[in-house]
């Protein structure tokens, strides 16, 4: 893998992982347009570590407060808004973790295609538009509730289908529950921490069991690029979200879906 490929793919991962526009829809473009081959387990792992580090550092105070409060709740010190949020994040992770563990091979066998990505990019983009247009926007992430967290968690299962966008579908679900745009986005980003961590652990296990040779030097460049681009993306997205809403991302998804259909029809 050339340094150009590493830079481009790391930028795509970092810039699209937390925006509601589907990272898989963008990662398919280099292979379709430039003929780039699959980057391999080690590269997937290193990019996940980069984006995981970004969200952990950006939300470090929230993570510290939730962790302390969660441990306190286990010790019988009572509930706080941080301990409740921590429990909701954990509960919301279970559906995708279970279904992903048992159904990942089925998804990769039957749903990992360019046309599936084009369809899901378009359809779930329209669903995001509908949810944003009809959202009450009266709750923060601390008012999600257990039922709401589970609803968002089951919505996250749909992100196993390539092109759906994990952040997109979970923000959509949050808006449906009446969360503010910022609250839905923050809950989505916080719940990405355990799911990305588990995906990284899974990739690490597969890598350990494989005999893949890796030149780690260039890959750490990819980790750094995905980290910096992801943390900047989170920051700018949360600042602009209430100003611009979801419509720019919806329009972008529709254009991207149409473009994917176009290039796939020519292959």
Curated annotation (Swiss-Prot):
EC number from the UniProt entry: 3.6.1.27
Catalytic activity entry: di-trans,octa-cis-undecaprenyl diphosphate + H2O = di-trans,octa-cis-undecaprenyl phosphate + phosphate + H(+)
A matching Pfam family: BacA
Any single GO CC term annotated in Swiss-Prot or TrEMBL for this entry: plasma membrane
PANTHER family: UNDECAPRENYL-DIPHOSPHATASE
Compartment(s): Cell inner membrane
Protein name: Undecaprenyl-diphosphatase
UniProt cross-references to InterPro entries, sorted A to Z: UppP
Extra remark beyond the main annotation: Bacitracin is thought to be involved in the inhibition of peptidoglycan synthesis by sequestering undecaprenyl diphosphate, thereby reducing the pool of lipid carrier available.
Organism: Psychromonas ingrahamii (strain DSM 17664 / CCUG 51855 / 37)
Chain ranges passing through the membrane: 1-21, 39-59, 87-107, 113-133, 144-164, 189-209, 219-239, 244-264
Job of this protein: Catalyzes the dephosphorylation of undecaprenyl diphosphate (UPP). Confers resistance to bacitracin.
Membrane topology: Multi-pass membrane protein
Keywords, alphabetical: Antibiotic resistance, Cell inner membrane, Cell membrane, Cell shape, Cell wall biogenesis/degradation, Hydrolase, Membrane, Peptidoglycan synthesis, Transmembrane, Transmembrane helix
GO MF terms, alphabetically ordered: undecaprenyl-diphosphatase activity
Top-level taxonomy: Bacteria, Pseudomonadati, Pseudomonadota, Gammaproteobacteria, Alteromonadales
Protein family: Belongs to the UppP family.
């Amino acid at each position: 893998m050339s340094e150009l490929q590493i830079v481009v793919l790391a930028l795509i991962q970092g810039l699209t992982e937390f925006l509601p526009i589907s990272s898989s829809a963008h990662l398919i473009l280099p292979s379709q347009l430039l003929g780039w081959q699959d980057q391999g387990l080690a590269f997937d792992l290193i990019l996940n570590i980069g984006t995981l580090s970004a969200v952990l550092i950006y939300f470090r105070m929230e993570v510290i407060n939730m962790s302390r409060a969660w441990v306190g709740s286990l010790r019988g010190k009572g509930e706080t808004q941080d301990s409740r949020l921590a429990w909701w994040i954990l509960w919301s992770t279970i559906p995708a973790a279970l279904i992903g563990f048992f159904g990942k091979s089925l998804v990769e066998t039957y749903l990992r295609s360019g046309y599936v990505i084009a369809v899901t990019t378009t359809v779930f983009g329209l669903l995001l538009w509908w949810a944003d247009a009809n959202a009450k926007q009266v709750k923060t992430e601390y008012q999600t509730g257990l039922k709401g967290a589970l609803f968002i968690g089951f919505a996250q299962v749909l992100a196993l289908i390539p092109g759906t966008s994990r952040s997109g579908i979970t923000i959509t679900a949050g808006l449906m529950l009446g969360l503010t745009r910022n609250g839905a986005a923050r809950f989505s980003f916080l719940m990405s921490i355990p799911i990305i961590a588990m995906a990284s652990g899974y990739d690490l296990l597969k890598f350990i069991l494989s005999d893949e040779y890796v030149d780690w030097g260039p890959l750490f460049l990819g980790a750094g690029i995905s980290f910096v681009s992801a943390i900047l993306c989170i920051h700018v997205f949360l600042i602009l979200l209430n100003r611009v809403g979801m419509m720019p991302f919806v329009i972008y998804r529709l254009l991207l879906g149409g473009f994917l259909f176009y290039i796939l029809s020519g292959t």
